[in-house]
UniProtKB/Swiss-Prot annotation:
Lineage: Bacteria, Bacillati, Actinomycetota, Actinomycetes, Micrococcales
Residue numbers binding Zn(2+): H577, H581, C680, H684
Domain notes per entry: Consists of three domains; the N-terminal catalytic domain, the editing domain and the C-terminal C-Ala domain. The editing domain removes incorrectly charged amino acids, while the C-Ala domain, along with tRNA(Ala), serves as a bridge to cooperatively bring together the editing and aminoacylation centers thus stimulating deacylation of misacylated tRNAs.
Gene that produces this protein: alaS
Subcellular location: Cytoplasm
Listed name of the protein: Alanine--tRNA ligase
């Protein structure tokens, strides 16, 4: 049975049981705590946790999901994959355990001819929570399953909760017995390779509190409305129904494996044992197939490669796939062959991968191209690092490996492999330490951004009393009432002068940071108190929280207030936000519709806009964008907002940010009608002339395939242009030319400077040659070896010392000779030793001498027997280091 038929039967069955068919949500989760939709129940969390009223009592879906926590295990087992489809049925206070069990059994065991999946009942096993006698009895009563095929497990396996206080309940899991060739008998408890879990039924019936761990919490009572949340892994069921070894060989994945095999000339053998000689290649082909499919689906849902968040996950998937193909022997670009194979396998269920394939493929191919460039440039840098490490007689440092990984995106496994080929080890502990420190910095940064919003329970309580009404679209001041005051994340009854608080009002004109627009600031005043609003956030949907400080008096938890937004700052922010829409429209007009928005930020007087584009903008293009934007401002276009259905907005061609989740009703901002039409919840000027002017600052890369433009608007644009004019005036006075001739004068000056630098370089080399001629006469005998030890003083770099040392070695002839020259470059001592063949035969080795000298200098070094280089931190020890070299040659 094909995957498309499996999902169709699922939906048809549950619709026949009174369920509403709900389309799959985006892979980009609407839950801000999740990067991706990781389970079928994620879109239904607000209903399952009673935060929102469900619009239906019963629902069913086939949900696209992404999980990358076990990405290193992909391809090695039959159970791990990054993209999967979760078939689910849900009840919100309607049916409960018995019907959930009956539905599952009926669909699984009904014959194929009668619309079911036709699984043999004797192949099915069930687990229940060890204390859930009711579930076991319902299985026995409704299915006729023998008691010996029902096994009990503990909380770790068969109990569901969010890990926070709230709803929870036992689960019951259904397993399929693949037969004795896959492992020992004895049910799921004995062997989960033989007994594959296909369906999990979660019975949400309890309220829990005092959660100490996943298995340690207090059950405080039963839920007033009991819910059902089930999930069946479509790929696992397809594996069974299609009688293949693992989920990589199902109809939606196997075509990519076949294409990878054809491109590489390798044979795919379904090897799962690490002892099988084909196992390594088979794992690589499975990784390719899995990751290509995941990348296809992520890009279809609006994710683009970047260095953080969802974009980083996508980038890693693509690069792991490309890397796996290289390990299979394919070094050319391979996505143009692999991605269409995945598209053709998935388009029956997800038509968008075909209709939007031009955009999807453009993004994927650009990322592969960039990665191949990364490998080329990274290889050159790695070869330099390997050369230096070998010269120093040291392993490749973890710092070098980290720099390659962090700066150039060079995979650590590739670094390890290439270092091994060069006969070097890599300091992996240091690399892992640096990676850990980077993660800790990122986590600390994320924690800092969350601030007191890390615990949302107090805000959830306030939200239960009603959402904050936002009045700031039409007014910037108004009366309101305090709904709650928080200090340190806890509700308090009052706050006094100097206290930093979080304030919730019944209604507010203050705009909370959202959609790239910075929050409003201003004052909240009342009877005897003044509170300054510094920031406004929405830690939970529907609740505006004012971060503030009490400047005067005492504010109470039920005070009546006057809320007043800083009008000038809001106007400047509106200039920037409307300016952002104008720049977006200008980019589309000049570059084309493929310049898709990737993100934006605007605050008083300033905007930045990120968009999909693979190369830097020329000066002429930047000027054109700036001109089109300012013409739109001068044309006094009307800016209008409309609220409409999402479908209507899309039909009108309104632009939306890919990856964002929108409700059924959206706010559309139009500039001169269709000239610019975007989904947007921000605030804007009434007409474009109120912006005044826009000054583009330039563009820069913000990750592979993405660019960023920045601009000032309004008075900030004026100040920026005034500062540039002042700079031009200063330069014209300094260079004594009119502004129109500045560029020519600067070019002429730079040409002269380069000529002077070349002359200085020539003179420096002449000085070194002259010095060598003089120094050769200073050679001393050290136990039969002619030795020159010279302190060159300040030098431009190690190359100066190398040239001098090699020149001196040549001048000393074929008799045993060694040269040690040292100097100071950028306040750090450098030493270089060179020996000739006769000296080396006499036991004088440059590498050993440099290590000795560098140790005295407070550093390290090494190299070959004929030439070696080192350095340190203590420039005052240069004479002592040179003396030590001479003494070592004498004592050898």
């Amino acid at each position: 049975m094909k995957s498309q038929e499996i999902t169709k039967r699922w939906i048809d069955f549950f619709v026949s049981k009174g369920h509403t068919a709900v389309p799959s949500a985006s892979l980009v989760s609407s839950d801000p705590s999740l990067l991706f939709t990781v389970a079928g129940m994620v879109p239904f969390i607000p209903y399952l946790t009673a935060r929102e009223e469900a619009p239906y009592n019963r629902a069913t879906s086939v949900q696209k999901c992404i999980r990358t926590g076990d990405i290193e295990e992909v391809g090695k087992t039959a159970r791990h994959g990054t993209f999967f489809q979760m078939c689910g049925n849900f009840s919100f206070g309607d049916y409960f355990k018995e019907d959930a069990i009956k539905f599952a059994w009926e669909l699984l065991t009904t014959s194929v001819d009668d619309g079911g999946y036709g699984l043999p009942p004797e192949k099915l096993w069930v687990t229940v929570y060890e204390e859930d006698d009711e579930a076991e009895q319902l299985w026995l009563k409704n299915t006729g399953m023998p008691a010996e095929r029902i096994q009990r497990m503990g909380k770790a396996d068969n109990y569901w909760s969010t890990g926070q206080p709230g709803p929870a309940g036992p689960c019951s899991e259904i397993y399929y017995d693949r037969g004795p060739s896959y492992g020992v008998e004895g049910g799921p408890i004995a062997d989960e390779n033989r007994y594959v879990e296909i369906w999990n039924l979660v019975f949400m019936q309890y309220q829990i509190d005092n959660v100490r761990s996943k298995v340690d919490f207090d059950i405080t009572g039963e839920l007033p409305k009991k819910n059902i949340d089930t999930g069946l892994g479509m790929e696992r069921l397809a594996m069974i129904l299609q009688d293949v070894e693992n989920m990589y060989e199902t109809d939606q994945v196997r075509p990519v494996i076949d294409k990878a095999a054809a491109l590489s000339g390798k044979e795919y053998t379904s090897a799962e044992s690490a002892d099988d000689p084909h196992h390594t290649d088979d794992v690589r082909m499975r990784v390719v197939a899995d990751h290509i499919r995941s990348a296809l689906m992520l890009i279809a849902d609006g994710v683009t490669p970047s260095n953080e968040g969802r974009g980083y996950v996508l980038r890693r998937l693509i690069r792991r796939a490309v890397r796996s193909m290289r390990l299979l022997g394919v070094e050319k670009a391979c996505l143009p062959d692999l991605l269409p194979a995945s598209r053709d396998a998935m388009k029956g269920v997800y038509p968008v991968v075909e209709t939007d394939f031009d955009r999807i493929s453009r993004i994927a191919y650009a990322e592969e191209k960039a990665f191949l460039r990364t490998i080329a440039s990274g290889t050159a840098r790695l070869e330099d690092a390997v050369k230096d490490s070998k010269a120093a007689g040291q392993p490749l440092s973890g710092a070098d490996a980290f720099a390659l990984h962090d700066t150039y995106g060079f995979p650590i496994d590739l670094t390890l492999e290439m270092a091994e080929e060069a006969g070097l080890k890599v300091d992996e502990p240091e690399f892992r330490k640096l990676m850990l420190e980077q993660r800790q910095r990122a986590q600390a940064d994320a924690k800092g951004k969350k601030g007191s919003h890390a615990d949302l329970s107090a805000f959830q309580e306030l939200l239960a009393e009603g959402e904050t009404v936002f009045t700031g679209y039409t007014e910037l001041a108004g009366e309101s009432k305090v709904r709650g005051i928080l200090s340190g994340g806890r509700k308090v009854s009052q706050a006094s002068t100097g206290e930093e608080i979080e304030l919730v009002l019944a209604e507010t004109p203050f705009y909370a940071e959202a959609g790239g627009q910075a929050a409003d600031t201003g004052l909240i005043t009342g009877d005897g108190f003044v509170v300054e609003v510094l920031d406004v956030q929405r830690p939970v949907k529907g609740l505006s929280v004012h971060k503030a400080i009490v400047r005067e008096g005492e504010i109470g938890a039920d005070s009546l207030v006057q809320a007043a937004v800083d009008r000038e700052r809001r106007h400047s922010a509106e200039q920037a936000h409307t300016g952002t829409h104008i720049v977006h429209a200008a980019l589309h007009q000049i570059l084309g519709p493929e310049a898709l928005q990737r993100g934006s930020y605007n605050k008083a007087g300033y905007l930045r806009f990120d968009f999909a584009w693979g190369e830097g903008l020329s000066a002429a293009t930047r000027s054109e964008i700036e001109e089109v934007s300012n013409l739109a401002i001068r044309n006094n276009f009307q800016v209008e907002t409309k609220v409409m259905a999402l479908a209507e907005a899309k039909a009108l061609g309104a632009m939306a940010l890919f990856g964002e989740n929108y409700g059924n009703e959206v706010r559309v901002v139009e500039i001169d009608g269709a000239w610019s039409r975007e989904l947007c919840g921000g605030t804007h000027v009434a007409n474009t002339s109120l912006i005044g002017s826009l000054s583009l600052l330039g563009d820069q890369s913000v990750g592979s395939g993405n660019r960023r433009v920045e601009a000032f608007v309004g008075m900030e644009a004026f100040r920026h242009l005034a500062a540039e004019r002042a700079l031009v005036t200063e330069l014209t006075e300094m260079l004594k030319v009119p502004s129109g001739l500045l560029a020519d004068r600067i070019a002429t000056t730079l040409t002269k400077l380069k000529t002077v630098e070349k002359e200085l370089e020539r003179l420096r080399k002449e000085q070194l040659t002259a010095a060598a001629a003089q120094l050769v006469g200073t050679a001393k005998d050290a136990a039969g070896v002619k030795v020159i030890a010279h302190d060159a003083g300040q030098v431009s770099g190690a190359d100066d010392l190398r040239g001098l040392a090699l020149d001196l070695r040549t001048r000393l002839g074929s008799e045993a000779a060694a040269v040690a020259v040292a100097g100071v470059s950028n306040d750090r001592p450098v030493i270089l030793v060179a020996t000739n063949e006769a000296a080396r035969a006499a036991g004088v080795k440059a590498g050993a001498l440099v290590r000795l000298a560098a140790g005295i200098l407070g550093g390290g070094g090494g190299g070959k027997d004929d030439v070696a280089q080192g350095g340190g931190t203590d420039a005052a020890k240069v004479p002592a280091a040179l003396t030590a070299v001479v003494d070592a040659i004498t004592r050898r």
